[in-house]
Swiss-Prot record:
GO terms for biological process: protein heterotrimerization. This is PPi-type phosphoenolpyruvate carboxykinase 1. One of its GO terms (cellular component) is cytosol. Inorganic pyrophosphate (PPi)-dependent phosphoenolpyruvate carboxykinase, which regulates the carbon flow of the central metabolism by fixing CO(2) to phosphoenolpyruvate to produce oxaloacetate. Can also produce pyruvate and diphosphate from phosphoenolpyruvate and phosphate. It comes from the Eukaryota. The lineage of its organism: Eukaryota, Amoebozoa, Evosea, Archamoebae, Mastigamoebida. The gene is PEPCK1. Keywords: Coiled coil, Cytoplasm, Decarboxylase, Lyase. Signal peptide: none annotated. It is an enzyme of class 4 (lyase). It catalyses: oxaloacetate + diphosphate = phosphoenolpyruvate + phosphate + CO2. It comes from Entamoeba histolytica (strain ATCC 30459 / HM-1:IMSS / ABRM). One of its GO terms (molecular function) is phosphoenolpyruvate carboxykinase (diphosphate) activity. Monomer and trimer; forms heterotrimers with PEPCK2 and PEPCK3.
Amino acid sequence: MFNQEKGTDYPILNIQELEALADLKLSAMGKEYPKHDKSDAIDVVAPLVDIIAEGDQESTAPIDARLQTFLNSYFAECGEEVPKIPDNTFILDREGLGRVLSFPPHKQEFFCETMKSYKIKQGVLHNPAKDKRTTVGVFHICQSDVPVPADKIECPKIAFLRMLKAAFYGAPDDHLIIPYTAECKEPTRSWVSLYMRPVVVPGVKGVKGFEHEKATEMHFFVPGNMVSCLDFVESVFGNAGNPRLSKNDAALDPLGWTGHSGMAILAPHLTRMTKKECGLPHISQATERQKRERMCWEKEDELYNDGKTFKMYCRDASGVICTIIADNYFGYCKKEVKTQISYSANLYGFAEEEHAGGAVTRPSYDLGEACKAVQYAEGYKFSEMVEKNKHSIIVKEEGYAVDKKYPEGIIYVPEDSVFTIEDASIKFNHNGKEESILLTPKVNYVLPNGYTIILHDTMTSRRWTLRGILPQYTLCHKPCTVSGGGKSEISKNISDAIFEGKMFVNNKEEEFKAVQKVFDHDFSRRYADGEIKSAHILDPNVTLGTVVKMLTPSSFFTEEHNEFVAAIPPMIVELALTIKSLYREEWKGDWQSRITVDKINGKEGHELKYRKMPLPSQYLRVGFERDETTWRVFQLRKDFFPAAKLQMEDDITASVIVPTKLLKTPINTNGKKACKIVKNCELRLFQRPDDAVFRGYDKQTEYDFSIPGHFISNYQPMTREEAKDFTKDVVRLYQYTEPMRKCLQDFVAGKDEAKYIVSSSHTRLVQDGDKLVGSKNPRYLQRRPDMLDPEYTYMTFKAIQLFRKISDEEPLYTPVDAVLSGRRNNPPQVAKNGMKLRPLSVFAPLHYFELPELLMECITSMTGASPSMFGAGSEGALTKGPFNSLPAVVDLNNYLLGMICCGYSGFVSSASYCGPHYKVAHDISLLIPEIWSRMRRYEQEPKYLIEHGYLEPCPDVTYNGKTYSGKRLGYRITKDFTVHYFSSIFSVPNSVMPEDFLKPELQDLAIYADSYEYIEQTDKGIAMNYVKDGTVEGACPPLKALIYIMANGEYNGMTRESKEFREMFDAKTILNSEWYKERLVTRQKLEVAKLNKDLAYLNKTIAEKPRLAETLNKQIAAVKEELQYVSSEEYLIDIDGSIGTDPYPYKCMKH
């Protein structure tokens, strides 16, 4: 949520302290450190440093011991030395150390072969050699018992082993120089490392067997001059401290650890290794797969992977994964942590790592200048609310209450409260007497049911209004979403796409008469089915939403009614809706005297005013016209406020499926067996602010770029002189919002010591053929909004708690409500490398898929071109193909079961384009949560939407004599959907999406047919990979049948249309199957084995380190209690409804 009132973004690092710590650590390593005043203290503690250094050299971090044991065992058959994991690295055990090490102390830039780095006014700017990642030919997996999927390149063990040696022992000297020491006489050449504990399984409070949050562990190594990559990774996933210390040993926190360990090594120099040096075979001795994947050589000087970037994994089902990355682009580093979270989730069970965005979304409305709380809090009592919230609120003598945590920002008022802007008061009765408190801005006034009212300044019109936010929420979850598909946008505030105008009339008298004629019309016989409904527009019992629908032609209305409303000029409709939104009963029909125009030069003007203030009108962009530059703009309803959103996910999500029978407090289950609880794995979000190139449009990014402490990449640095020239263009300078503009002006004025600055609209210049162009992949790390504004986060959950009548001591659960994935579409295009990109132009704005077709979408995850990476096509299963080190059937099995257990329905929205001619950017991604949050729960169900004509099956389409089945594309929204549900947002909802917008085949049938064939061919090709590599055998029965049908058109006589096949996806059939029960038993067996192993490790540690006995004995008691429960029959009954653990990886193991 965009909020400038909550102070700065990142905590400011104490650079002096961190530099002193860096000096101390370098001294302990026996290395030279930069000489400056703050280093003098080191001389005093030199003897102590020597003692620490000597002890440090003799210790091995427990994670490294686990990793080394795995490597020794895994490569034993190779008959070559296994390299030792370096134990003399510079360990980043304090947040911010990596940032300090990225530059020499008194320099503001550092340049090397792999990176150009700058200290800038807003933080740090790092521009790596490549400005984006590629996924083509990048992902290599070492041979093991677990099959290497056909979409990855299989690497012989000997090749990985030699790469590992070359990574650690062969790094070039200049790569090892730590920038902080670059100016020293003897620069320190060393590896730098970071220990992390990223979340894998969210904890579920109060639920036995699920209550402990579980993390994996990971040790990340980089050559010294790439320390900025660790600064980046730490900023996203946190810092788990020094891995050598017992207090940080994951195995001594057994209930918080999945039992899995990982390592990652950056080694860009490996692109210079030859295939022969790696031990790849000559082509004459290569297998067919090695020839196909070019993992063999003809000439001795052939480079491994043709000298291009690659990531190489070594893993099996034992729970250890090691990765070598031959590049230093930040995206690869982040995605590597994602890969290891995914690996751990798939082996552990219960959980999924999801490529998802998501937000708690609560509808919000303009309540006008006065309102009565009783109409929003029916059935709730202030006294009952107080009783259930004794620990979190303080009741005042006057009869209202304040929050204990945020007493100035959250005030609780009785259900009979009356809010009035005119006298700035909230009045209510207490002990038989009327009480009044002051109504002030920036305060949440909370009714007993959680409904929140805020005094809001609309800013541009200077009009104050009451904003009402409902406590009922929809957690919109956007999984399986391709790059550029709108993961971040689902949680962004739509206000950036809204702009405001004023209302005008040509002839006040004539237009007021026309409005009155509309008000006087009899609308009671409008329904085509003959139903009579009294509906005078100004009747207080008739809502603004009803009036919007009444004034919009619809198939539900008679032809006569539709003709009448279609003949009303748009300006009259707008004026009628404006008057309805302002109208009060006490006006007694006299609205005309309240709406005025000024007299100018003795004549009536044209600008409409209410209470001497201009009447505003708001508009929203929904895509572009066919010229792809002109905005398609639509007027918003007069009571519209953007939904109140709390971001829950952005890119990397850990989720757990919990049986609803185990939850301690109620949720909206609708009788479903389980629900999904999500947690964001990231502390900061790697944002690509595409719209920031338009000055003044992306307010959040411009605000972020005005404050210090940021990690920024792929922007163009400006010196003070360059910025001075840049700001001379005053017209364009003032197109920025105030924070960005002032930041630039302050820099030019020399108000700080920074040598460089970046502008949010000017991305890094990169080579494109023979010219320089702005990078299409600008990035920065944004602090999570929910962490930046804890009061807003607290208020969101408090409102939900009050609405559910839960006490403040009971656990509150906010599971996923709606699954709304995203696809990125494109017309036929020619890429910059000259390659033709086929169209992906069959999707309407929103589709619903039944499970088989939804799984087909997830298996192929097709996408159009995205600024994040090179190329287009399939992103692999659940869009995680490139980042999944285990066979994708494990993820797909989990996804299918999750949808079944939770009873979720799969919707998919469009980004970039709808059909070949309507460019929509991310406007649909922003719009869908607004609509979904305003729908009732039963209205979100596909069955209801289909029965009422709001969803229609995609039709079969014939082109050049060939018929393309609509079944593959599921269902899509209809014109009736837009009229009915868009009416909660737009004044003229039927104008937003014309027929060809909703039916892309009407835009260009030839492109539609080509798109369909592209999807069909991709479906077949991707499915065939599962058959070729044998991993189809790891698929659960319904998924296995689907993959074979995609590959071959049939399976055991069944096609996709067969009743027998579709019944395989029935929830009861699946949850009563033997293969599902096996998953539950597998989870139990694995957990019992892990807990026994944990006990052995705890006892061994006590024997070796008696000083830890008191702490570890408590852990032992907790583990024994957990073990007793997990070993019981009760546990198996309790976890029925979860996804259990997929046994397939373990069945692959030969020992």
